[in-house]
Amino acid sequence: MIEIIVPATTANIGPGFDCLGMALNLYNKVLFEEIEDGLQIHGCEERFNNKENLVYTSMIHTFKKVGYTPSTGFKITMDCHIPESRGLGSSAACILAGVIGATELSNSKLNKEEILKIATEIEGHPDNITPALFGGMTVSIQDQTSIHFSKVPIQNNFRIYGLIPNFTLSTKESRAVLPQEVSFQDAVFNVGRTALMLASFMNGDLELLNFSIDDKLHQNYRASLIPEYPSIIEKLNFLDIKGSFLSGAGPAIIVIAGKDNLGLADRIQNRMLELENKWTVKEFNMDTQGALIKRWR
C-alpha cells in the first residue's frame, strides 16, 4: 500500500497572477492498494466513485506516459480535507496524488521535475502544482516545452488565515470573467507590486507587504462573482491586517497578519457572522515539504 499526502495551495497571492503559489498545512491523503481486478474508490462523494475520478484519471495518464500496463485492479481510499472549488488547490492535490501514486505503483524512476511536467499537463498551469509538490512559496512559469520554477526563501514572521465560504466557484467560471486584454498601466502596476511583494516576503517587511499585495489583473473582475466581497475587504481592513487576496480563482480569501496580532481568527469570524453567507475562518501555516510518500506493508 502506498499513501500520498498532498498539501493545499493558494495561488496568485495578490499581483502574482498565474505564477505565484504557496503550500498550506491542509492535506488530502490518498491510499493506493493493488487488488485482483476492477476499481474501488472510497472516502469521497458518490459522484466521484467512478473512472472519471481525478485521482484515477491522473494515475492512468501517468501509466501511459511511462509505458506501464497494470496487471491488477486498484483500490483508492481518499481522506480529503481540502475543500473542493474554493481556490485552495483541490484539483492540483488530486492530480499530484494520482501522478505520484502511479509513479510509485509502476516503479518508474521519475524525478520531481518530471512529475511536475506530467501533473501540469493535466492541470493546465503550474502555479498550484509546483508548491503542492515542492512546498513553500514558489514562482513558476511555463513555455511550450518546459516549466521554469524557483522556491522563494521567505521569512516566517507572519500569520496566514483562510476565509472559506459555504459556496463554490469553478475555475472555468472565474476565468470567464477575465478580460482578453489589459491596459499597459495595469500591467506595470502588477509587475512592480509583484517584485516588491516578493522582496517584502523575503525581507520580512510586512509594512511593504501591505502596500504591494494589491492587484489589477484579476481580483477586481472576479470580485463580482463573490457575494459581499467589497464588504468583506472593508471589514478586514479594520482588523490591522497586513494584506488580503483571493486564493487562486476564489472564492476563498487569504489574510496575512503579523505574528503579534493575537486572537485575529476570532475577530475575523465575528465580522463574518454579519454576512449573508457562512464563512469559516481557519489559521494556516506554510507547508515547507510538499507532497509526501508513505509505504505501508
UniProtKB/Swiss-Prot annotation:
EC number, as in UniProt: 2.7.1.39
Top-rank taxon: Bacteria
Reactions catalysed: L-homoserine + ATP = O-phospho-L-homoserine + ADP + H(+)
Main location: cytoplasm
MF terms (GO), sorted A to Z: ATP binding; homoserine kinase activity
Any one of the GO CC terms: cytoplasm
Binding annotation for ATP: P83, E84, S85, R86, G87, L88, G89, S90, S91, A92, A93
Entries under InterPro entries matching the protein: GHMP_kinase_C_dom, GHMP_kinase_C_sf, GHMP_kinase_N_dom, GHMP_knse_ATP-bd_CS, Homoserine_kinase, Ribosomal_Su5_D2-typ_SF, Ribsml_uS5_D2-typ_fold_subgr
Gene3D superfamilies linked to this entry: 3.30.230.10, GHMP kinase, C-terminal domain
BP GO terms, sorted: threonine biosynthetic process
UniProt keyword annotations, A-Z: Amino-acid biosynthesis, ATP-binding, Cytoplasm, Kinase, Nucleotide-binding, Threonine biosynthesis, Transferase
Location in the cell: Cytoplasm
Pathway listed: Amino-acid biosynthesis; L-threonine biosynthesis; L-threonine from L-aspartate: step 4/5
PANTHER family for this protein: HOMOSERINE KINASE (PTHR20861:SF1), HOMOSERINE/4-DIPHOSPHOCYTIDYL-2-C-METHYL-D-ERYTHRITOL KINASE (PTHR20861)
Functional description taken from the UniProt entry: Catalyzes the ATP-dependent phosphorylation of L-homoserine to L-homoserine phosphate.
Family affiliation: Belongs to the GHMP kinase family. Homoserine kinase subfamily.
Protein name per its UniProtKB record: Homoserine kinase
